[in-house]
Amino acid sequence: MQLNPSEISELIKSRIQGLEASADVRNQGTVISVTDGIVRIHGLSDVMQGEMLEFPGNTFGLALNLERDSVGAVILGEYEHISEGDIVKTTGRILEVPVGPELVGRVVDALGNPIDGKGPVNAKLTDAIEKIAPGVIWRKSVSQPVQTGIKSIDAMVPIGRGQRELIIGDRQCGKTAVALDAIINQKGKDLICIYVAIGQKASSIMNVVRKLEETGAMEYTIVVAASASDSAAMQYLAPYAGCTMGEYFRDRGQDALIIYDDLTKQAWAYRQISLLLRRPPGREAYPGDVFYLHSRLLERAARVSEEYVEKFTNGEVKGKSGSLTALPVIETQAGDVTAFVPTNVISITDGQIFLETDLFNAGIRPAINAGVSVSRVGGAAQTKVVKKLSGGIRTDLAQYRELAAFAQFASDLDEATRKQLERGRRVTELLKQPQYQPLQVWELAVSLYAANNGYLDDLDVKQVLPFEKGLRDNLKTSHADLIKRIEDTKDLSKDDEGALRSAIEAFKKSGAY
């Protein structure tokens, strides 16, 4: 077969046009210095803020400081093998973590790697840990409750799906206990929970996981752990990783609850990284953007509209709104809520639950100070029956606290004042609750009804809790239909109220407590 010259040139041209050059264009730089997990790199001219960088030994870092002559990066993991002169490559990728239902029931680190010894996660999707929160147009007002099962919270500081409610208090006053009770109470309520442990002892995290397994709560919970022995970078990233895992469910029309325990430790880790990167320190040596550190995280918790979910899923999920509820925890020093990080987070969130050491030591547990605890949006999400019955409790407690302060100085009190003080003591006793024993809506309603209608007034203070427990047990055995109606309707009709009154009076007469 002979080819003429024109055919040969055409053939060569077509071959040249069809040639595919697979050159991997990557920017390279050199390590100048390594100090405490912070690396300075020279020669990376084309690098993004927050981009992943590849170091020798399959180690990755995060570019945080972009300067004229060098890049400051934080190493994710071990950095002992990295030395001056090592080659660093850009990856062109922002840090991502695995997301999806495969993570439920697992314990993972801040990068989504399993650390529970149960094998690989096998998640099909990954997502960026830094994302922009949904805009105002895509949000819906909070209207559905998150029942924590804790009497004082559900009655006086209600939490709604899509809300950000801060839990704040000194160390060892029950902040984690409140958060765990909220998770345990979500059994059968179609709410995925994410518990992010930041800077805690590994043994404490293990105890939390064990308790969640014992109560069957791990079936719908993801635990993201960055313990005290992990690097500052891991403690800084863990909340964002947990938030991304929660957003997967929110954006697909499901409900999720995330607990950050605690954000004070994250702020400390970020302060450490910032100071090592030579960023200028401000108040309490925190960097200037520590407010933005927490605001961009907590703004991602939201109730999103049906249109947002439909648009996000390309029409696969219709008519369903999703939510991500955040319960950030902040640790104060000697009750000082005017410190930098506590005031920042108080201003970002939709309310706060104050826990006080004095109340805790006095045996009032959970040690919630109802006077200064507020929920700015949760009232709209409260169930009808609890909303109807809880108003009186808040008033009784407020008046009791005011009168108790004056009663210390007064020797003779009039009858009305003494009655008010006695009622307040019994309500305070009623709101005590053991850990890991969350209550259903009907149980809370019955307790509130008994307190509001004076059934506790003639009891001795020590009899209040036995009476409450005995009453609940009695209703379970003798009035199951009444319980079912309250649970189904989340309301107390006139007929049901009459039946409940008769049941309480009959139980009180029997004296079986």
Swiss-Prot record:
Top-level EC class: translocase
Location(s), subcellular: Cell inner membrane
Keywords carried by this UniProt record: ATP synthesis, ATP-binding, Cell inner membrane, Cell membrane, CF(1), Hydrogen ion transport, Ion transport, Membrane, Nucleotide-binding, Translocase, Transport
EC number: 7.1.2.2
Pfam family, one: ATP-synt_ab_C
Reaction equations catalysed: ATP + H2O + 4 H(+)(in) = ADP + phosphate + 5 H(+)(out)
Binding site for ATP: 169-176
Membrane topology, from the record: Peripheral membrane protein
CC annotations in GO: plasma membrane; proton-transporting ATP synthase complex
Sites annotated Required for activity: 373
GO molecular function: ADP binding; ATP binding; proton-transporting ATP synthase activity, rotational mechanism
Top-rank taxon, per record: Bacteria
Keyword ATP-binding: yes
PROSITE patterns in alphabetical order: ATPASE_ALPHA_BETA (PS00152)
InterPro entries, A to Z: ATP_synth_asu-like_sf, ATP_synth_asu_C, ATP_synth_asu_C_sf, ATP_synth_F1_a_nt-bd_dom, ATP_synth_F1_asu, ATPase_a/bsu_AS, ATPase_F1/V1/A1_a/bsu_N, ATPase_F1/V1/A1_a/bsu_N_sf
Summary of the function given for this chain in its UniProt record: Produces ATP from ADP in the presence of a proton gradient across the membrane. The alpha chain is a regulatory subunit.
Subunit details: F-type ATPases have 2 components, CF(1) - the catalytic core - and CF(0) - the membrane proton channel. CF(1) has five subunits: alpha(3), beta(3), gamma(1), delta(1), epsilon(1). CF(0) has three main subunits: a(1), b(2) and c(9-12). The alpha and beta chains form an alternating ring which encloses part of the gamma chain. CF(1) is attached to CF(0) by a central stalk formed by the gamma and epsilon chains, while a peripheral stalk is formed by the delta and b chains.
Recorded family membership: Belongs to the ATPase alpha/beta chains family.
Protein name, UniProt field: ATP synthase subunit alpha
Gene: atpA
